[in-house]
Amino acid sequence: MRSINYIIAIGFTFISCEILEPVYDNTLDLDNNAPPALLFTPETSTTTLGGSAAVTLYALEVESIAGVRARIQYDAAKLIVSTVSAGSFFSGSQAPVFIYDDNGSGILDIYSFYMGSDRIKTGTGDIALIVFSTKLPGNASIELTTESELLDQNGELIPIQSYGTGVISAE
């Protein structure tokens, strides 16, 4: 009788246990994106009509880069680029060269170059903080185009494996 109780208890234990499948919803998960990559975090932002949404541009698991050109396409009918500021990835003994160009047509170019004594950076970090303001309700997409580039210290291209996308929703 006692062994039957153990079998029943063990049976309930196995039946009641649920094996959970992992959810990879973090943009910076390596299982979610192949490095080296340029990505946005958060991938989805919600704000009010006329409100602002901040998005960070990240370099994921890059090796020996000296510069970045990020070309971001956004829905100019629904979004305005309010501000763009340098991230901390290229910070060092000298401030990075950081330039951006946005004429309101839906293309934002960000250029950032490392000026530290070792001339290259490796790892994961934030390149820029971009604040968008909404003009119309609904979803507006943002995406890094294949014209984006990672450069080594000799100006040679480093292939990018993953390009980030995002959505900004105005309610």
Positions of PLM-derived features:
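Sec-dependent bacterial lipoprotein signal peptides
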Residues: 1-16
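Acidic, low-complexity intrinsically disordered segments
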Residues: 17-171
